[in-house]
Amino acid sequence: MANLKDIKRKIGSVKNTQKTTRAMKLVSTAKLRRTEELAKRTKYFEDAINATLRQIASSIKKYKVGGIKGRYFEEPEAVAVVDIIFITADKGLCGGFNYQTIKTVRSLLEEYQSKGAKVRLRAVGKKGIEFFNFQGYELNDSVVGLSSSPNYEEAKNYILKSVGDFLEGKTDKVILIHNGYKNMITQEMKAIQLLPIDISKYTEEVDGSMLEMEPDESEKVLESLLNKYIEFNMYYALIDSLAAEHSARMQAMDAATNNAKEMVRSLTISYNKARQESITTELIEIISGMEAMK
């Protein structure tokens, strides 16, 4: 009977776990839908900035206003220092979401170090911070809370530290790594070179009538736009990462719920078999006792 009690207790425990994972899946699904909408709205503004940058860059090229120069666009002859900014979740229970980001960061870290470059790691998210601290890596900067609750002003202040170091010549590249949202069941790793900006993709020919600027204004407008471009890239990456996190957690909790369901089924079969064996044993004992009394 002790065996039956143990099995029954396990069934109850697994059912409670199943309720928890099912609830977490529903919460993640609801959060994903909200984050999806926010991502769409943010992407709209990012696309608008990219379109304006393309027009301004083409205008500068058309009128040859000082050329497209400056620290923002200069590819270094040799990369001595690289800033790698990476985004992970503040929480777990989201499958391989954090692992994939960490794996990509380590791969890029080793690649640049093998070329003799110094890599400065800047972590956003508790899970990434905990991993690299545990592994003994030095983090140049870290922040908790921003990946789970993206805020434009906080994202702006965070990325401007790297922008400032880059413009002052302290770093040669700024790379942003995060796990991005593709659809409800798929995430994709993204590694974006924020600085220097590859201006070639923004200098395609556009209709000159779309934008007219005075020569002395174009450089100022471009500089202001570049900062917005970098800020929005950081902000959108945070939202994109959060959507991917909710998607990964939703899948992980769905898998856990299904596993719990299968475990309950298996334990129920074991319980019924054990109960049947117990009843059979008791019947045999009763019959044996009656036979002994004859």
Curated annotation (Swiss-Prot):
Recorded topology in the membrane: Peripheral membrane protein
Keywords in alphabetical order: ATP synthesis, Cell inner membrane, Cell membrane, CF(1), Hydrogen ion transport, Ion transport, Membrane, Transport
Annotated CDD domains: F1-ATPase_gamma
Localization in the cell: Cell inner membrane
InterPro entries: ATP_synth_F1_ATPase_gsu, ATP_synth_F1_gsu
GO biological process, one term: proton motive force-driven plasma membrane ATP synthesis
GO molecular function annotation: ATP binding; proton-transporting ATP synthase activity, rotational mechanism
GO CC list: plasma membrane; proton-transporting ATP synthase complex
Superkingdom of source: Bacteria
Broad class of where this protein is predominantly found: membrane
Function of the protein: Produces ATP from ADP in the presence of a proton gradient across the membrane. The gamma chain is believed to be important in regulating ATPase activity and the flow of protons through the CF(0) complex.
Similarity annotation: Belongs to the ATPase gamma chain family.
PANTHER family: ATP SYNTHASE GAMMA CHAIN, ATP SYNTHASE SUBUNIT GAMMA, MITOCHONDRIAL
Subunit comment: F-type ATPases have 2 components, CF(1) - the catalytic core - and CF(0) - the membrane proton channel. CF(1) has five subunits: alpha(3), beta(3), gamma(1), delta(1), epsilon(1). CF(0) has three main subunits: a, b and c.
Protein name as it appears in the record: ATP synthase gamma chain
Gene this protein is translated from: atpG
